[in-house]
Swiss-Prot record:
It comes from Sinorhizobium fredii (strain NBRC 101917 / NGR234). This is SsrA-binding protein. Its main location: cytoplasm. The keyword RNA-binding applies. One of its GO terms (biological process) is trans-translation. One of its GO terms (molecular function) is RNA binding.
Length: 159
């Protein structure tokens, strides 16, 4: 029997939206389950998914992932899935209400950050609540990143 204190969460990241942190100021993150078909899970396990152009929206008290790309599973004959279909996200009612309130009142966006398999083998989506950055904010972020690289380089040379 495993002890709870010694358990480590093992995440196998399948798809990551790397531009999201550059284009949005991330306020909060949530872990959501995905409603998938069998061929979609097998396709995800091959690791060729893409969520860089996807987004999440709330419709009828539910959160949906839109425009995510899961390629067809090659070994599935005619029972394959649609590559860019809408996928339902599994969140608690409290989380759904909180996300809907933030999107409707504060003008925030729901951004998918990454899809991964947790330690139990379930496909999960890391969903972020964020505000879009302006152009000057993006420039400031890149300047700060460049300065940190330069600073680390100088410290490495001297130290």
């Amino acid at each position: 029997m495993a002890q709870k204190g010694s358990e480590r969460t093992i995440r196998k990241v399948v798809a990551e939206n790397r531009k999201a942190r550059f284009n949005y100021e991330i306020v909060d993150t949530y872990e959501a389950g995905l409603v998938l078909t069998g061929t979609e899970v097998k396709s995800l396990r091959e690791g060729k998914a893409n969520i860089s152009e996807s987004y999440a929206t709330d419709e009828g008290g539910e959160i949906w992932l839109i425009n995510s790309y899961l390629p067809e599973y090659l070994q599935a004959n005619r029972f394959n899935h649609e590559t860019r279909r809408r996928r339902k996200l599994l969140l608690s009612k409290r989380e759904v209400n909180r996300l809907q309130g933030a999107v409707n009142r504060e003008g925030m966006s729901l951004i998918p950050l990454k899809i991964y398999f947790n330690d139990r083998g379930r496909a999960k989506l890391e969903l972020a609540l964020g505000k879009g950055k302006k152009l000057h904010d993006k420039r400031e972020t890149s300047k700060e990143r460049d300065w940190n690289r330069q600073k680390n380089r100088l410290l490495k040379e001297r130290g």
